[in-house]
UniProtKB/Swiss-Prot annotation:
Catalytic activity from the UniProt record: 5-[(5-phospho-1-deoxy-D-ribulos-1-ylimino)methylamino]-1-(5-phospho-beta-D-ribosyl)imidazole-4-carboxamide + L-glutamine = D-erythro-1-(imidazol-4-yl)glycerol 3-phosphate + 5-amino-1-(5-phospho-beta-D-ribosyl)imidazole-4-carboxamide + L-glutamate + H(+); L-glutamine + H2O = L-glutamate + NH4(+)
Protein name: Imidazole glycerol phosphate synthase subunit hisH
Domain Glutamine amidotransferase type-1 intervals: 11-215
Keyword Hydrolase: yes
Species in which this protein is naturally found: Cyanophora paradoxa
Length: 215
C-alpha cells in the first residue's frame, strides 16, 4: 500500500457515470497500491484528492449521463484545482470539444476533436488487442520505469486528435494510421488503451498514477 505525505493510504476516486464496468479499474488500483473509491456525485468529486474517469461506450450517451448526474462542472473544477486526473478510453475522448461519433459537446477541457479510425483493407475496426506504444513524450510520468515500446491492450474505433500536438504523450499505429494513444497536460493524463487490462505494464502505469497522487 502506498501512503501519502501524512502517512495515510492514497485514495483514488473512480467516477461512476454508468458507462462501463468499474470492477477491473478498481482491482487495478488495488493491485497498484491505491485504495479505490467509486463516486457518483458532485460533492464526492469536490472532496476527492485524485480522480479517474473511465468509460466504455459511446460519446453522446456518456455526455448525457454526466449532465444528468450534474458532474460536468465538478469535473472541470477538480481539474482546474490541479487534482491528479486520469482518463481511460472513453474518459480520454470526453476531455475534448467534440466527436465524430455524436452531436453532443464534450467537456472541452482540451482543444481538439475525436475522429473515427479510417477503413483500410488490411485492418479491423475496432482496433482490438495488443499493440506497442510509441512514447512521443518519454518524460510523461506514466512511463517511468517502462521499456521504450511497451505493449498495451486496446479496444476502440475512435481516437483523440488534439489541436496542440505537444499534449500527445504516446501514439500507436493501426494499419498505416498513427493515432493518439495517450495525452499529458499539466495535471491531466489520459490513455486510449486499458491499463487495467494490460497486465504488468498496465499495473505499473497505474502505480505511477498512484505515486503521482502522493505529490
Amino acid at each position: 500500500m502506498i501512503n501519502s505525505k501524512n502517512n495515510s493510504p492514497i485514495e483514488i476516486s473512480i467516477i461512476d457515470y454508468q458507462m462501463g464496468n468499474l470492477y477491473s479499474v478498481c482491482k487495478g488500483i488495488e493491485r497498484s497500491g491505491g485504495i479505490p473509491k467509486i463516486i457518483n456525485s458532485a460533492e464526492e468529486i469536490k472532496k476527492a484528492t485524485a480522480l479517474i474517469l473511465p468509460g466504455v461506450g459511446s460519446f453522446d450517451p456518456a455526455m448525457k449521463q454526466l449532465k444528468k448526474q450534474d458532474l460536468i462542472n465538478p469535473i472541470k473544477d477538480a481539474i482546474s484545482e490541479k487534482k491528479p486526473f486520469l482518463g481511460i478510453c472513453l474518459g480520454l475522448h470526453l476531455l475534448f470539444e467534440e466527436s465524430e461519433e455524436g452531436i453532443e459537446s464534450g467537456l472541452g477541457i482540451l482543444s481538439g476533436s475525436v475522429k473515427r479510425i479510417k477503413n483500410e483493407p488490411e485492418i479491423t475496426i475496432p482496433h482490438m488487442g495488443w499493440n506497442q506504444l510509441q512514447l512521443t513524450n518519454p518524460k510523461c510520468y506514466l512511463w517511468d520505469g517502462l521499456t521504450k515500446y511497451p505493449w498495451v491492450y486496446f479496444v476502440h474505433s475512435y481516437f483523440a486528435q488534439p489541436k496542440n500536438p505537444n499534449v500527445i504523450a504516446a501514439a500507436v499505429t493501426h494499419g498505416t494510421q498513427q493515432v493518439t494513444a495517450a495525452i499529458q497536460y499539466e495535471n491531466i493524463s489520459a490513455v486510449q488503451f486499458h491499463p487495467e487490462k494490460s497486465a504488468s505494464i498496465g499495473l505499473h502505469m497505474l502505480n505511477n498514477f498512484v505515486q503521482q497522487s502522493c505529490n
